[in-house]
């Protein structure tokens, strides 16, 4: 991992940001291969928080959460407590604690539930709710069911909706029938389709409900969209309606979901968000990164999406070079352009994990 550490922790500016992102996610992949690599990965990623890029540090916190290892908690706690850090970074640290879901972090999350920044407050609220859910009877049943389903998928070589989304969500997807029985069967066979969109949309847009319940509806709509067909477009449009919500955190998560889905129907919404200079930079950054994954020219050209590709490319280039734009927006566009280029021409560069020998 020495070469990866050198790349990720290059604070001189000589290593391009997009290359450092590739190094980060290569480290994330290697972490899963052994406990030794996991410890080394956590150590390297923790060192990288010395960088001055809020975008990179936000991504570092995200990855630490996705590693789902309690040894990352000291670093995440330190970041959340550091009021000099950008709120976007602190929010991601709190969300990462929720992903790891260790009840020992509940006191610090409760403390920062009254933080001066609303995105940090809301994230702490979500993380507390997720940890509570994970340790409830329903959450434990869901965890067991998913573990059994994962084992069955590994044995059969098949996978369903849940296996398509490996990231740990900040809230479990709502089921068509919110019950313990539904939770137990979710990983085994709950089918999300167009008939569920009205219920999920209603929950998503109901500001009288908790943020956690609305997030659950958000990820349920994602699962509907992943199923394809008419339900996919309906679900994407339902999610897009959530972009009118008053919470920047909520809007940014919808953009993240669009990035997971890579559905062409979300392109107009993401372009609108990125071009809206009055929108919160956290939301614009997520829209930019979502656009980087949505369009693959060769795949979609036959579906009359060439114009979409051109618009996305032009818009990302515009904001990547606009020195008056917030730094996190510019850098997100740079990373998105790198992803877009790779998706369309894998021969233009070799990913660092295949071109650079990795020494543990």
UniProtKB/Swiss-Prot annotation:
Belongs to the deoxyhypusine hydroxylase family. GO terms for molecular function: deoxyhypusine monooxygenase activity; metal ion binding. Fe cation 2 binds at residues 252-253, 285-286. HEAT-like PBS-type repeats lie at residues 56-82, 89-115, 213-245. It comes from Mycosarcoma maydis. Its cofactor is Fe(2+). Binds 2 Fe(2+) ions per subunit. Pathway: Protein modification; eIF5A hypusination. Its EC number is 1.14.99.29. The lineage of its organism: Eukaryota, Fungi, Dikarya, Basidiomycota, Ustilaginomycotina. Fe cation 1 binds at residues 58-59, 91-92. This is Deoxyhypusine hydroxylase.
């Amino acid at each position: 991992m020495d070469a990866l550490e050198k790349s990720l922790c290059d604070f001189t500016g000589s290593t391009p940001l997009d290359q450092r992102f590739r190094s980060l996610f290569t480290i994330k992949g290697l972490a899963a291969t052994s406990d030794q690599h996991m410890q080394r990965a956590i150590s390297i990623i923790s060192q990288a928080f010395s960088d001055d890029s809020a975008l990179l540090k936000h991504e570092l916190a995200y990855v630490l959460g996705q590693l789902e290892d309690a040894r990352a908690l000291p670093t995440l706690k330190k970041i959340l407590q550091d009021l000099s850090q950008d709120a976007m970074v602190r929010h991601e640290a709190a969300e990462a604690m929720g992903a790891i879901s260790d009840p020992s972090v509940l006191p610090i999350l409760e403390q920062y539930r009254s933080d001066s920044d609303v995105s940090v407050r809301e994230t702490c609220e979500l993380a507390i709710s997720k940890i509570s859910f994970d340790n409830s009877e329903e959450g434990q049943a869901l965890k067991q069911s998913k573990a059994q389903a994962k084992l069955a998928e590994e044995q059969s070589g098949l996978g369903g909706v849940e296996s398509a989304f490996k990231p740990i969500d900040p809230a479990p997807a709502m089921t068509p029938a919110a019950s313990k029985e539904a939770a137990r069967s979710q990983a085994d066979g709950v089918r999300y389709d167009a008939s569920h969109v009205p219920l999920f949309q209603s929950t998503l847009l109901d500001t009288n409900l908790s943020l956690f319940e609305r997030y659950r509806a958000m990820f349920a709509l994602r699962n509907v969209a992943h199923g394809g067909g008419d339900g996919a477009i309906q679900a994407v449009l339902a999610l897009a309606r959530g972009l009118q919500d008053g919470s920047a955190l909520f809007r940014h998560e919808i953009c993240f979901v669009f990035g997971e889905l890579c559905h062409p129907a979300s392109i107009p919404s993401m372009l609108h968000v990125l071009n809206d200079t009055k929108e919160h930079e956290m939301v614009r950054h997520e829209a930019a990164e979502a656009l980087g994954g949505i369009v693959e020219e060769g795949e979609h050209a036959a579906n009359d999406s060439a114009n979409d590709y051109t618009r996305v490319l032009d818009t990302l280039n515009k904001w990547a070079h606009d020195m008056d734009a917030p730094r996190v927006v510019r850098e997100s566009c740079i990373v998105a352009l790198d992803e877009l280029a790779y998706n369309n021409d894998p021969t233009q560069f070799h990913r660092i994990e295949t071109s650079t020998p990795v020494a543990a």
